[in-house]
Amino acid sequence: MKIDLIISADDIKEEKVKNKTAVVIDMLRATSVITTALNNGCKRVVPVLTVEEALKKVKEYGKDAILGGERKGLKIEGFDFSNSPMEYTEDVVKGKTLIMTTTNGTRAIKGSETARDILIGSVLNGEAVAEKIVELNNDVVIVNAGTYGEFSIDDFICSGYIINCVMDRMKKLELTDAATTAQYVYKTNEDIKGFVKYAKHYKRIMELGLKKDFEYCCKKDIVKLVPQYTNGEIL
């Protein structure tokens, strides 16, 4: 098995993801939201690229659909919820369809559509994602959403954590230089919360008063679910 890594949604190329197992990571905060919502009983998450498409989809899915997402970290006008995992509690999401659009994460998911399997990864479910990777037994590309098309420390160290979890389960692995570096960064900085504080994205999260979101998104393996994207929906 070979593991590769893409550093941002802007860097996705079809030949890099086609027929592989793609693991999409937007640790702060889209993939953490998706994982949390589904773990709390959300029926499905439908990722879309634009606000206009989200408004159209919510009509298609009817009364059990809710709108969530952000632009530049802020809740979108007219939406039910922002991109805070703390908002997606069981009483809010159980049995609902979440229509979601975000600045970085949903672009990374949609950009990975030629992959054989698309898994949604985060620190919250890193061990479970690693188990699924081993089960699928296919070459892997970890797709970092990044931040506005740029490299993001948070997604990178989360990738390293998941790669490390796979390495604990499989000895015969081939890592690209990017994947090797991510795993090394994690192994030398296993306190993810402490290391992510160096990230530009962290500063933005703090500016928005989202410390609780940050602390939650850094919790390792509190979710055993591995969301999978197929035919336009994440289940």
Swiss-Prot record:
User: Which Gene3D superfamilies is this protein grouped with?
Assistant: ComB-like
**Molecular function GO terms recorded:** 2-phosphosulfolactate phosphatase activity; magnesium ion binding; sulfopyruvate decarboxylase activity
Instruction: Please indicate which superkingdom the organism of origin belongs to.
Output: Bacteria
Name of this protein: Probable 2-phosphosulfolactate phosphatase
- Tagged with keyword Cytoplasm: no
SUPFAM superfamilies this protein is in? ComB-like
Q: Which family does it belong to?
A: Belongs to the ComB family.
